[in-house]
From Swiss-Prot:
Family, similarity comment: Belongs to the glycosyl hydrolase 22 family.
Domain of life: Eukaryota
EC number: 3.2.1.17
Residue ranges of every copy of the C-type lysozyme domain listed in the record: 1-49
Role noted for this protein: Lysozymes have primarily a bacteriolytic function; those in tissues and body fluids are associated with the monocyte-macrophage system and enhance the activity of immunoagents.
Gene, per the UniProt record: LYZ
Record keywords, A-Z: Antimicrobial, Bacteriolytic enzyme, Glycosidase, Hydrolase, Milk protein, Secreted
Protein known as: Lysozyme C
Gene3D superfamilies to which the protein is assigned, alphabetical: 1.10.530.10
Organism listed in the record: Pseudocheirus peregrinus
Length: 49
């Protein structure tokens, strides 16, 4: 299933992800958007990277 961007941001903020390991909430949203398009079933294997 897919989350909406604002839904993800709200949950991430509630889980104190803003600033986690120096990563801003905006950067987490960007990362999730690019890696999975907010698809909760997506798996990225990072082949050799």
């Amino acid at each position: 299933s897919k989350m909406k961007k604002c839904e993800f941001a709200k949950i991430a903020k509630e889980q104190h992800m803003d600033g986690y390991h120096g990563v801003s909430l905006a950067d987490w949203v960007c990362l999730v958007n690019n890696e999975s398009d907010f698809n909760t079933k997506a798996i990225n294997r990072n082949k050799g990277i």
